[in-house]
A protein has these predicted regions:
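Mobile "lid/hinge" segments at catalytic clefts and subdomain interfaces of large enzymes
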Residues: 1-27, 41, 105
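Glycine-/charge-enriched secondary-structure boundary and capping motifs
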Residues: 22-25, 32-111
Length: 111
């Protein structure tokens, strides 16, 4: 939902280390955010989304974990390569505006 870097400023992660940080996540383009929101609404309308979760307090790792709590028989097959972030701490703990969408196996949601 945002093309901003995976910043850690203001995050729960930095707070747990006793700091605040100086680089904070932001929505750099309101137009991009609106188009991303519209695309998600289209996927929901097409019945391709089974569940979704916002990335907020705790970052991506927290959103992913919270999505598994409802069913202890479920698992995840994840690839973060398309996100373009090599720093795994930034990737997992940044609280940048984002969504995690759950789809059925084999469903293609984007081109």
């Amino acid at each position: 939902m945002s093309r901003s870097p995976f910043a850690l400023g203001g995050s729960s992660f930095f707070q747990s280390l006793g700091g605040v940080g100086s680089e904070v996540p932001a929505v750099e383009s309101a137009d991009y955010f609106a188009r991303a929101f519209g695309a998600v609404q289209g996927l929901v309308g097409d019945g391709k989304v089974l569940a979704g979760h916002d990335v907020s307090a705790g970052g991506l790792v927290t959103a992913l974990l919270e999505m598994t709590f409802a069913d202890n028989r479920s698992g995840m097959d994840l690839s973060f390569a398309a996100l373009g972030e090599r720093d795994v701490v930034r990737l997992l703990f940044s609280e940048k505006p984002a969504l995690v969408l759950q789809v059925e196996d084999g469903v293609r949601t984007c081109e």
